[in-house]
Amino acid sequence: MLGSTSCSKDDDDDNNNQNNNNVVVNPTDEDDIKETAKYNFFGAELYSNETFTYGKFEAKMKMAYAPGCISSMFLYYNDSYKGNGEVWNEIDIEVIGKEPNGFQSNIITGKLEKKVTSEKIHKIDSPVADNFHIYTVEWTPDYVAWFLDGKEIRRSDASNDTKKQVAALVKPQSLRFNIWSSASTEWVGTLYQKNIPITQEIDYIKVYDYDTETGTFTEKWTDEFDSFDSKRWGRGNWTMENVLERPKNVVVEDGILKLKLTKELK
């Protein structure tokens, strides 16, 4: 059930232009630092091989929660990271370690060298990791909207978007899900090794096309994860701050796709 922050319209907030992901802060617990030195840490990312320009994206998930951990669903322009003038396009749903009773929505535009963001935290009445919820993003030329269990939580309209972020979402984006650990303890908290392994579970993913003439969505496909479809999905194999995202941490078990945050002795 939704808490008091059930739905919000976007407004201009200069504090939302901060990019917290690049702050490197070491864990403050001495025993945790010692244990960290013994291990390598591994995360996971699932990404669609297909890209989309507008649409509706729905997933039934049990998001992961632990201090220091990020569990996410997001749309992402695949060349955003390149810099050198390339635009950044991204739409996020993230459960962050310091906010167990809610999730963060965000649009990221601008460029690698100067990102524009609009983070908002949305509270619910119980920890998101306790149950499966249906998370949905609608992306059109006129608005971006976020939903939880069918209820609209936030909407950013192009008509009153002072940062012009909706209009800046011009690139085709892949659909992605990941679990990782940020170097910024200020943003997500400290990852304590006793909490690992941590798992994000996905029951199904559903994608809809958007018709710009009629303003309607039409179901395109649903994946219920009876198996892993390598034609539809790829597995991440790269570093995300404190972890290496590796393919073997994306698995399908009993009709559930699982993204795992794990550790191994060096």
Language model regions located:
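GH16 jelly-roll
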Residues: 9, 15-266
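C-terminal motif of bacterial Sec signal peptides marking the signal peptidase cleavage site
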Residues: 3-6
